[in-house]
């Protein structure tokens, strides 16, 4: 998974592929 905020956002959206 990504680190920091990206990881948390990934969990919230039900996806571990959130990259912004």
Swiss-Prot record:
GO molecular function, one term: glucan endo-1,6-beta-glucosidase activity
Keyword DNA-binding on entry: no
Protein keywords: Cell wall biogenesis/degradation, Glycosidase, Hydrolase, Secreted
GO BP term, example: cell wall organization
Leader peptide range in chain numbering: none
Subcellular location: Secreted, Extracellular space
Catalytic activity line of the entry: Random hydrolysis of (1->6)-linkages in (1->6)-beta-D-glucans
Main subcellular location of this protein, as a coarse class: secreted
Functional pH dependence: Optimum pH is 6.5 at 40 degrees Celsius. Retains at least 80% of activity after incubation for 24 hours at 4 degrees Celsius between pH 4.5 and pH 9.5.
Temperature-related behavior of activity: Optimum temperature is 50 degrees Celsius at pH 5.0. Stable when incubated for 30 minutes at up to 50 degrees Celsius, little activity at 75 degrees Celsius or above.
Record bears the keyword Ubl conjugation: no
Chain's role: Endo-1,6-beta-glucanase that has highest activity against the beta-1,6-glucan pustulan. Also active against the beta-1,6-glucan lutean. Lower activity against laminarin (beta-1,3-glucan with beta-1,6-branches). Little or no activity against gentiobiose, yeast glucan, lichenin, scleroglucan, curdlan, barley glucan, CM cellulose, HE cellulose, pachyman and pullulan.
Protein name: Endo-1,6-beta-glucanase
Native organism taxonomy: Eukaryota, Fungi, Dikarya, Ascomycota, Pezizomycotina
């Amino acid at each position: 998974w990504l680190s920091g905020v990206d990881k948390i956002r990934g969990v919230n959206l039900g996806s571990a592929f959130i990259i912004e």
